[in-house]
Amino acid sequence: MKLLVFILNKEEYLEEILEAFLELNITGATILDSVGMGSILAQDIPIFAGFKNLMKGSRPANKTILTLIPENLVQPAIKAIEQVVGSLEEPGNGLVFILNVDQIFGISKTF
């Protein structure tokens, strides 16, 4: 089992991403509001105020999607994400990382 974590920079793609996951039979995910460290530093700490100029055009908030998936769905899920947001090699399209999950508690283990 794998945990796919996707930090979505463009919130307007959220519904389309979730629909793409459903087409792959990925039926569960948790969506969190998230903010990058640079945004916080630029807003709240005067010494880092120069970050504001560097971050013009970037979004202050993101959506972070967490979903547990079988290993055979990792590459199809990444491909589905890229079909919606564009290449993840391009800055600003988002960030995906995959973690191994050894044990799961609190949900059905048959999915």
Which role fits each region the language model picked out?
Residues 1-111:
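Positively charged, small/polar-rich N-terminal and surface patches that mediate targeting and assembly
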